[in-house]
């Protein structure tokens, strides 16, 4: 596009004056200053443009003045020269140039601003103009406080109907509408092409306009599209369409500028550096008729529909960037106008939106941070906060606890405690006279919830509420929502709990409540619930969790105090017997027997569980125990579990927190086995793979000592910390067919140094790095390490095995080493034999079953047996039994 002429008719004379002023200033410079000026000049220039060095290298003062005037134009050339003179240490000449410029041209300082300087002024204007927005109650608030970030998904993402009501879209499908996501909207594709039109679509009221204004604000704040967009303009389509008369695009731009001296022609001369935000484009009229013909000239006065239509169709400024907001049903109607748009769907809350909500609710930053931090640590509760109403409930409870000065870690550590606190807060806030009635209504509500859970019902008729005298009560208003459905003769009214989880919580609470102090068949009812929960795919899982959470001594006291009734201890004893019974008949886990030929294939992480697959039942039992937060009860419940075996669990942080708590409370002699489990969080896995690629690209080998110390805490860090607790009696840990990242090995190594009861460690068919083996060996060699038995199965040769063997010279407690199934090259066997004969080696038993050994290696081992007759070395060839064929060899 040709650059439009300057609006002033005196451009020619002003150019001559500028050339004269430039020459006068440059002639005052010495040769050294002029040389320095030329070098500084090639590094500066508005809008990222600078005069090519070839034109400057041999230019004298006359040539430089001409080049400046022709390349930049009158005012920009003078401003560039002034700044360059200052940088060339000719400040006196720069001051004289500025003074003569004002005298000769006679212009105000606002008009003297170049495009580059006006960018700063315009950004400041936008920041001031859009810093505050009005809420629906007309209260003015800061946009940074008002804006709630959204999830934005590409057009190809799964439809919203594919998700449950409380399910949050995965990060791969949708991204938060933060600056990173906004920047990605105009990201180049695989072929290097950048979209010029992006459409944000979504239903009414989801926040498209606010998001568009936040994009404009963030751009002005320097957070978005740096180096890409010089000017961004917000165009409210509805207002522009209703505005009478005709106006050009240049006029609309000028209306948004802080003054009438804006260099609009120069702005329009580089349309590729402009961003137009068209908000509410679905309000544009349909195509058709001459009045709807798109405008093609930015200086042509036309109707709002024609100007906006020209921008949408790219007939006007085809290289400019467009961000269009529209309702979800409207993009089809806009397709005829849009030119190769890229669409994105605006969705609801993201995880970080929850944090935003907490800070809005509390306002006091310190309290908000405390409340949010504890909720973030409870993954179950944090997931529920995807629903704004649940966020409100949680915040209400936490605010009450903070106002009372209570410790959140004690009163709000589980989902059960938070829900109970919310209900008791309702009772506490009621007048004393209304207390008994409210208690009775809550008991009836719990009974209704229980009947619904057991009968798999979520909808309740009005007559059911009337029978329980709940209709019109305060508890109905607080905990039930009303739905009106069109019926055949009249509207059908039904009620449902504000959240399914609340129904399940109240159902669990019903088992602990009594009527009039006379115990009901609570224990029998609990037995029915628990027997039902033991069935696969049970719908009673969450109710059972809540029940255990209510059985802690502290929760039971709260119930008695607020509900005015006695809670039967029989309920707790029934639940304890049920858990202990699960320990005797717990679903089995595949034994640690794997064909040696499988090798490291078995160390692959488990695939995503298919829908409908039975959940990991032992882990669910641990969740129930975790809810109690009562150490003695958990320890007593786990007495009937000789081992905790978890198979194919894709551990999340909440899973680890649950397991860690139960391990800390485990009784003496208990074992833990993790088989084919994923031991790294999804986001950590991505970071780890990136780190490996970077290490490979830099030619890095195994991790160095310094590198491993800088590793972040692993996903299993809380578990290993629990193992070091003085009250933890875990005696055996086995990790089988898992990938063990270096961070896991580092954290486990540190735990081995302090675990008070751990005497046996099994590392079977795991994928380990050389650095990982080294760190584990260091932990086993630590003087305070109490591990007596180590079982290692490494089907493939491992360079780090020498660290494990070398550890035998220092390990004070180790008496048994089982290397069955490992591949031991001859040099490794030679090294092993040398270590076994070291005076510091206290090993008593070495198992080499299913290990292929050369004749020389066998002879070396025989020599060790003769030198140390008390050392038991088991191998078929050493025991006089022939070595079985390779295809029959199997590891345990």
Swiss-Prot record:
Function: Acts as the sensor component of the NLRP6 inflammasome, which mediates inflammasome activation in response to various pathogen-associated signals, leading to maturation and secretion of IL1B and IL18. Inflammasomes are supramolecular complexes that assemble in the cytosol in response to pathogens and other damage-associated signals and play critical roles in innate immunity and inflammation.
Organism annotation: Homo sapiens (Human)
UniProt-recorded name of the protein: NACHT, LRR and PYD domains-containing protein 6
Summary of the tissues where the protein is detected: Expressed in peripheral blood leukocytes, predominantly in granulocytes and, at lower levels, in CD4(+) and CD8(+) T-cells. Expressed in colonic myofibroblasts (at protein level).
Composition-biased stretches (Acidic residues): 602-614
UniProt comment concerning the protein's domains: The poly-Lys disordered region (352-356) mediates the formation of liquid-liquid phase separation (LLPS), an essential step for nucleation and formation of the NLRP6 inflammasome complex.
Lineage, opening ranks: Eukaryota, Metazoa, Chordata, Craniata, Vertebrata
Residues the record lists as binding ATP: 202-209
Domain NACHT: 196-513
LRR repeat feature ranges: 462-487, 727-747, 755-778, 811-834, 845-868
An example Gene Ontology CC term for this record: nuclear membrane
PTM comment, free text: Polyubiquitinated with 'Lys-63'-linked chains, promoting the interaction with PYCARD/ASC and formation of the NLRP6 inflammasome. Deubiquitination by CYLD decreases the interaction with PYCARD/ASC.
Residues annotated as domain Pyrin: 1-103
Effect annotated for changing residue 87 to D: Does not prevent formation of an inflammasome filament
Chain positions covered by the region annotation Disordered: 158-181, 352-356, 590-614
GO terms of molecular function: ATP binding; double-stranded RNA binding; lipopolysaccharide binding; lipoteichoic acid binding; molecular condensate scaffold activity; pattern recognition receptor activity; peptide binding; signaling adaptor activity
Chain intervals with Basic and acidic residues compositional bias: 170-181
